[in-house]
Amino acid sequence: MKKNNRVVVGMSGGVDSSVSAYLLKEQGFDVIGVTMQIWQDKDEEAVRVEGGCCSLSAVNDARRVANKIGIKYYVMNFKDVFKEKVIDYFVDEYLRGRTPNPCIACNKYIKFEELLKRAWMIDAYYVATGHYAVKEYDEERGRYLLKKSVDTSKDQTYVLYNLTQTQLEHILFPLGKYKKDEVRELAKNLGLPVASKPDSQEICFVTDNDYGKFIRENAKEEIKPGEFRDTRGRFLGYHKGIIHYTIGQRKGLGISVGKPLYVVDIDAENNVVVLGYGDEVFGDELISYNNNFISIDKLEREMRVKAKIRYNAKEQDAVIRPLEDGKVFVKFDNPQRAITPGQSVVFYDGDIVVGGGTIERKVR
C-alpha cells in the first residue's frame, strides 16, 4: 500500500481514544473514527447501556466526540472474529486450568490485525489507539521499537508485546508522550463530552465481573467439581470446578488447616487443584511459549533483561535463554509470587520492549 496520511482511530468512547483522534487531526491526518462492535449479551435485545467498549453508551460517546472534533465516524462489526479469537480462547484457557489475559489477545488479533485489515480496505495507511506507549524507528537496528510511555504509571507496553514489525509500521500511539492528567486536561479544555469519564477496569465482555458464570454460560463442556490436594498429593476436600481458581488465590477455597492455604497448581487433566502454604506460591524459573520479539529478530543467546509476569507487577531482574521450538527459559534473580500459566511474561531492556511470551509453566 502506498503511504498516506489517512488513519483509522479505534474509538472506545473513552477519554484516551477521543484525545488521540483529536491530536491526529491537529497533526494534519485524515482521521476516521471507528468503534469496534465486538460482543453482545445472548439477549440481543438487551443492549447494555453502561459498561464495555461496544455498549450503547460507548458508541454514543464516541459519535459525540467525532462530531465535536469534526471527523468521520463508523461502527464496524467484529463479533464473529472476536468470539473466535478472544471469547473462545478465554473460556478454553480457563477450562485447561490456565489464567488468560484477553486484552492481549484482543490487541493481537482484533485491534492490530483485523482493524488494520479494515483500515487498508478504506485506503488508510495507519491505525491508532489510545494506548500509552511509544513507537520509534531505530535506524541502526533497522527496526521499529516499542518503548514505555512517558507516563510510567499508565504504561501499556505489557499488553502490546505481540506486535510485529509490519504492524508497528502502520500503528500510531498519539498519547505516548503525554501523562494521563494532561490528556484529561486537554479533553476538558476542548469541551469533549468524555473528559471526566472514568477509565474502564474490568474485562469488557464480563459485565458483572463474574468470570465463573460467564465461562459456564459459554463453555462447550460441563464444569465439574473435583478434589483439593496438597503438594504431597493428600486429599484436602472438594472444589467447585477449576475455572474458579488461579495461582496464588487464597479467598474462596473453603478449606481450613490452621494456616493460610493458597492455590499453587491446577492439574486440569485430573481436575485437581493443588493447595500449599505461602512459601510454595513462589518460584524463580519459568518457560514461556508463543514468544514474540520486537527489539531483536529472535533470541539467539542468553540475555539479561528486566521481566514482569503480570500487568501491574514491578519489573524484576532476570536472564532469558532460548530453548527448542521457540520457547524461552526465564530465570529470575529473586523468587516471584504466583507464576501463572496463561499469563504473559514481558522482557524489557530499559524503556525498550525486547519481547515476551505466554507462561507455559513454572519450572521451580
Curated annotation (Swiss-Prot):
Q: Which Gene Ontology cellular component terms are annotated?
A: cytoplasm
The active site lies at C106, C204
Q: Which reaction does it catalyse?
A: S-sulfanyl-L-cysteinyl-[protein] + uridine(34) in tRNA + AH2 + ATP = 2-thiouridine(34) in tRNA + L-cysteinyl-[protein] + A + AMP + diphosphate + H(+)
Question: One of this protein's GO BP terms?
Answer: tRNA wobble position uridine thiolation
Ligand binding (ATP):
G10, M11, S12, G13, G14, V15, D16, S17, M36, G130
Write down the InterPro entries for this protein, in alphabetical order: MnmA-like (IPR004506), MnmA-like_C (IPR046885), MnmA-like_central (IPR046884), MnmA-like_central_sf (IPR023382), Rossmann-like_a/b/a_fold (IPR014729)
Matching entries from Gene3D superfamilies are given as:
Adenine nucleotide alpha hydrolases-like domains, HUPs, Translation factors
**Which GO molecular function annotation, any one, does this entry have?**
tRNA-uridine 2-sulfurtransferase activity
Q: What is its EC number?
A: 2.8.1.13
- Per the record, the domain of life is Bacteria
Location(s) in or outside the cell: Cytoplasm
Pfam families of this UniProt entry? tRNA_Me_trans, tRNA_Me_trans_C, tRNA_Me_trans_M
Q: Which UniProt keywords apply?
A: ATP-binding, Cytoplasm, Disulfide bond, Nucleotide-binding, RNA-binding, Transferase, tRNA processing, tRNA-binding
Q: Which positions does the site annotation Interaction with tRNA cover?
A: H131, Q343
Record-annotated disulphide pairs: C106-C204
Protein's job: Catalyzes the 2-thiolation of uridine at the wobble position (U34) of tRNA, leading to the formation of s(2)U34.
Q: Which family does it belong to?
A: Belongs to the MnmA/TRMU family.
Q: Which PANTHER family match?
A: MITOCHONDRIAL TRNA-SPECIFIC 2-THIOURIDYLASE 1, TRNA 5-METHYLAMINOMETHYL-2-THIOURIDYLATE -METHYLTRANSFERASE
- For this entry, the protein name equals tRNA-specific 2-thiouridylase MnmA 1
The organism's lineage is: Bacteria, Bacillati, Bacillota, Clostridia, Thermoanaerobacterales
Gene that encodes the chain? mnmA1
